[in-house]
């Protein structure tokens, strides 16, 4: 019925992967909401994290505080290690592999210091002519 029009399409089969053993695993969740977990795998991946609720019951002050680390080996063989904190001040990560901003040029740094020391005047909008304004 389909004649020469039907041709089976090639299918993709992902390569078989070796299963990676879990060498260590722990997960602790406490009644107060605090927790801690860690794991280590046979291929060199490791992670740990702990967290707790800061100021529980205080609606505007509650904040989840979390800190942890993880590490692995990149495909090029580079060891990657990351340490992080997440709290009311946001997420902050540290690691040798993370890019860092270039230093601020000295002239700009001096300008920023002058701006910080100069008292700011309150903004006073100036009246402007508007020919389309209707009275």
UniProtKB/Swiss-Prot annotation:
GO terms for molecular function: structural constituent of chitin-based larval cuticle. GO terms for cellular component: chitin-based extracellular matrix. The modification Pyrrolidone carboxylic acid is found at residue 1. Residues 32-102 form the Chitin-binding type R&R domain. It comes from the Eukaryota. Keywords: Cuticle, Glycoprotein, Pyrrolidone carboxylic acid. InterPro entries: CHIT_BIND_RR_consensus (IPR031311), Cuticle_Struct_Prot (IPR050468), Insect_cuticle (IPR000618). Glycans are attached at residues 11, 100. Component of the abdominal endocuticle. PANTHER family: CUTICLE PROTEIN, CUTICULAR PROTEIN 47EF, ISOFORM C-RELATED. This is Endocuticle structural glycoprotein SgAbd-2. It comes from Schistocerca gregaria.
């Amino acid at each position: 019925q389909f004649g020469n029009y039907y041709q089976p399409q090639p299918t993709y089969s992902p390569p078989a992967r070796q299963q990676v053993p879990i060498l260590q695993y722990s997960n602790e969740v406490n009644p107060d909401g605090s927790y801690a977990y860690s794991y280590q795998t046979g291929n060199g991946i490791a992670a740990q994290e702990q967290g707790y609720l800061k100021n529980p019951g205080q609606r505007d002050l509650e904040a989840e505080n979390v800190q942890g680390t993880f590490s692995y080996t990149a495909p090029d063989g580079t060891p990657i290690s990351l340490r992080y904190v997440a709290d009311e001040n946001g997420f902050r990560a540290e690691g040798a592999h993370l890019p860092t901003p270039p230093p601020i040029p000295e002239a700009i740094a001096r300008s920023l210091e002058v701006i910080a020391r100069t008292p700011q005047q309150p903004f006073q909008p100036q009246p402007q002519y508007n020919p389309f304004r209707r009275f």
